[in-house]
């Protein structure tokens, strides 16, 4: 096949390295934030409460992973193809947000209503308190699903720094709200 000129290859590699570095920093921020939340919970509420949190977190991350993974597989390629047309990008974001909320809505409703049963099915009666934690996490997951189509726009635009900053800000807000909410809500 035709050879790609070296300057063009270098530009492509630079873009990939920049986005890759942004992903790594955002991933590190998420990991540190999750660790901080777990440390806060254990310090303030004890090991049993940390186990309850972890049980709810595992369930939440499993179902939200399916929803967001499917979104990325279908939506991201269409979005990157449309990035030069602002109206098309806007339409895609709106459509994807609506579709994601419609598809995830029944899962959210099921998790809100069936949280005690799901916890009992997957764990044991000792984890019953995790149902209330799972319900709070469902509310956060609704925000995730609603905001991810916009996050994909940042990625499709190649704005690695913006992605890194927004992800880091989101995890910082999560840690802060956990810290502020524990004395009030337990």
Place the predicted regions along the sequence by residue:
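Helix-terminus/linker motif at the lipid-water interface of multi-pass membrane proteins
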Residues: 31-62, 78-81, 116-126
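Helix-loop interface residues and adjacent transmembrane-helix termini in multi-pass membrane transporters
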Residues: 44-47, 83, 156-158, 184
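Interhelical loop/hinge segments that connect adjacent transmembrane helices in multipass membrane
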Residues: 1-34, 74-91
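Alpha-helical transmembrane segments of multi-pass membrane transport and lipid-handling proteins
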Residues: 67, 94-146, 172-183
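Alpha-helical transmembrane segments of polytopic membrane transporters and translocases
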Residues: 22, 37-40, 49-68, 98-102, ...
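Helix-loop junctions and terminal segments of transmembrane helices
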Residues: 56, 60-101, 151-156
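Short runs within selected transmembrane alpha-helices of multi-pass transporters and secretion channels
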Residues: 1, 26, 30, 34, ...
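Residues that define the loop-to-transmembrane-helix transition and helix capping
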Residues: 14, 48-51, 94, 128-131, ...
């Amino acid at each position: 096949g035709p050879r790609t000129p070296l300057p063009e290859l270098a530009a492509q590699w630079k873009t990939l390295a920049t986005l890759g570095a942004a992903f790594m920093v955002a991933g590190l921020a998420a990991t540190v934030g999750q660790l901080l939340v777990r440390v806060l919970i254990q310090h303030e509420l004890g090991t049993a409460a940390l186990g309850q949190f972890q049980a709810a977190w595992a369930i939440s991350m499993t179902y939200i992973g399916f929803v967001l993974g499917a979104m990325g597989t279908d939506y991201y390629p269409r979005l990157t193809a449309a990035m030069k047309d602002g109206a098309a990008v806007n339409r895609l974001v709106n459509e994807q947000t609506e579709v994601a909320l419609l598809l995830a809505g029944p899962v959210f409703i099921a998790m809100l209503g069936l949280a005690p049963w799901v916890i009992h099915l997957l764990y044991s009666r000792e984890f019953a308190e995790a149902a209330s934690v799972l319900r709070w996490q469902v509310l956060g997951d609704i925000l995730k699903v609603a905001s991810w189509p916009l996050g994909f726009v940042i990625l499709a635009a190649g704005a690695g720094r913006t992605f890194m900053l927004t992800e880091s800000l989101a995890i910082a807000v999560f840690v802060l709200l956990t810290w502020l909410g524990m004395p009030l809500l337990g």
